[in-house]
Amino acid sequence: MTARMDKRFAELKAEGRPALVTYFMGGDPDYDTSLGIMKALPEAGSDIIELGMPFSDPMADGPAIQLAGQRALKGGQTLKKTLQLAADFRKTDDATPIVMMGYYNPIYIYGVEKFLDDAIAAGIDGLIVVDLPPEMDDELCIPAIRKGINFIRLATPTTDEKRLPKVLKNTSGFVYYVSMNGITGSALPDPSLVSGAVERIKQHTQLPVCVGFGVKTAEHAKVIGGSADGVVVGTAIVNQVATSLTSDGKATADTVQAVATLVRGLSTGTRSARLVAAE
């Protein structure tokens, strides 16, 4: 639903602060725990949720998110169950935008039309499919947009002036700027380079620009949020889940609370980010 995403960014703009966009892996380490995590995210200060779709060959993900996907798959998580996770979340939260993030193969096997219909029914607002370039927009991007689901594109430091308009052409919701080349979980990039990149992208689009890769702490979120419309945190949250588990990968009584504590800290960073921008 494009309206929910647009409304959230409009609210944040009025507040003068960037969005905190939080990623977690659906089904990690099990369905009930991940639903608990999902419900805890907005309560702890998350503005937009990225719901990871586990996949057996996640080529763009670092070790932490790969392991999270493996735990979820081992626990029986499927794309259908990930959609159900969103639907269960929507029973108590109709305001927080949900973006499903992952790879095309599970969607293709599920069936594009069925997936989009089920995603709408589950209350999904957007998609990030990392292995579908603009040249393949007819596969999923265009059908999603026609049904009212945002299709969010990734831009990187190597997305030059010639490539950028093509990347942005059918993008909606927001632009996800991957602040460095490589896999997820990398170190924090140079804030001045991030600021310049965000400014460059904004010369080509009116969409919000959210920055991810490398953000792990409240201070990181504060610094990056000083120039971006949103700060995306994924690996730090997935690591927080992992460190709370038992030696055999099972959830503990502290798993959900551990994630909530981290997100509350990150939220203090984004909520003070505009103070940095104004100084």
From Swiss-Prot:
Pathway: Amino-acid biosynthesis; L-tryptophan biosynthesis; L-tryptophan from chorismate: step 5/5. Gene3D superfamilies: Aldolase class I. GO terms for molecular function: tryptophan synthase activity. PROSITE patterns: TRP_SYNTHASE_ALPHA. Keywords: Amino-acid biosynthesis, Aromatic amino acid biosynthesis, Lyase, Tryptophan biosynthesis. InterPro entries: Aldolase_TIM, RibuloseP-bd_barrel, Trp_synthase_alpha_AS, Trp_synthase_suA. The active site is at E50, D61. One of its GO terms (cellular component) is cytosol. It catalyses: (1S,2R)-1-C-(indol-3-yl)glycerol 3-phosphate + L-serine = D-glyceraldehyde 3-phosphate + L-tryptophan + H2O. Pfam families: Trp_syntA (PF00290). Its EC number is 4.2.1.20. It comes from the Bacteria. PANTHER family: TRYPTOPHAN SYNTHASE ALPHA CHAIN, CHLOROPLASTIC, TRYPTOPHAN SYNTHASE, ALPHA CHAIN. HAMAP family: Trp_synth_alpha. Belongs to the TrpA family. Tetramer of two alpha and two beta chains. The alpha subunit is responsible for the aldol cleavage of indoleglycerol phosphate to indole and glyceraldehyde 3-phosphate. This is Tryptophan synthase alpha chain.
